[in-house]
Amino acid sequence: MRSAALILMLIVPLGQIAHAGGAACVMAKYQGQTLDYALVYGQSHPDEAQEAALAELRRKGYADHGRHLDLMRAQNLSNLDRAYVIVIRSEFRDRRGKARSAMGCGFSEDSYRDAELDAVRDLQAYFWGWKPDLHGYELVRRFQY
């Protein structure tokens, strides 16, 4: 009886892991500018969503590393089955006066407001000099999956 309960406790979490959702927001960047993004959701795991988003950016022509692209980077991943999603963009000048652009993606299972806060945090995590109250941002995309 005791071993049956232990087996059941192990099976339930594995079943929850197997049914996790997957979403990824990947950015194409060049010399301090965010050129484009790809947002993929509905995959079985965030890694699969990330690979699909990278492939989408490659199809758009962002695979030419060295000449026209610094990198493609997954900025935010989610394992939520359902989520509120916000994508933001900011164009601003850094402390040296250089024009910059940056984007952030946010996910939340609770609300658009929480997804927006996650998008702001995401943008700050990848561009430390960006301040939302100083530089501002615009809403690019807002939806649920």
Where are the regions a protein language model picked out?
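Secreted/extracellular ectodomain signature
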Residues: 19-145
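Bacterial N-terminal signal peptides
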Residues: 5-15
